[in-house]
């Protein structure tokens, strides 16, 4: 059996790994606001880095942690997630080996992984399609989400 593999951010890194290691089980890949981990790519902004450092140290400031839990987000897990992301290293060679139909979706205003991360991913995967969305950062904003989903469904229809 095979499936369309979709992942966003760290989930995109995981989806890339699945597509690389299990191409026979992957119908297609959608990598959203993710990265190859290449060290030459632009880093996050200083402000964003400071915010992540606060999360990593358990300083959630004015965040309503219970409300975040209701959305399925657990800020307490951020230190583990950040450790995994930063220790994943440069996966460019792995990403270059992806040989399934791929859509790369990325925000034009992503402060965590600037658009060059999406561009680099698309450049490495032969035949991939890249879409950069205005008004999207490192999130899935309600104003842009219908277009993201529509593009994804069109892509699946082509597969």
Name each model-derived stretch.
Residues 13-21, 27-55:
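Flexible "cap/lid" loop of the alpha/beta hydrolase fold
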Residues 128-159:
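Catalytic active-site module of serine/aspartate enzymes centered on a nucleophile-bearing elbow/loop
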């Amino acid at each position: 059996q095979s499936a369309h593999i979709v992942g966003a951010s760290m989930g995109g890194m995981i989806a890339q790994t699945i597509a690389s290691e299990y191409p026979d089980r992957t119908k297609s890949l959608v990598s959203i606001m993710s990265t190859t981990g290449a060290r030459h790519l632009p880093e996050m902004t200083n402000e964003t880095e400071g915010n992540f450092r606060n999360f990593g140290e358990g300083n959630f400031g004015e965040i309503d942690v219970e409300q975040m839990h209701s959305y399925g987000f657990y800020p307490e897990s951020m230190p583990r997630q950040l450790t995994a992301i930063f220790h994943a290293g440069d996966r460019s060679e792995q990403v270059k080996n992806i040989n399934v139909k791929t859509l790369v979706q990325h925000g034009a205003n992503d402060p965590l992984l600037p658009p060059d991360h999406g561009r680099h991913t698309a450049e490495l995967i032969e035949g991939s399609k890249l879409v950069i969305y205005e008004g999207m950062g490192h999130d899935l904003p309600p104003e842009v989400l219908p277009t993201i989903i529509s593009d994804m469904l069109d892509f699946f229809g082509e597969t």
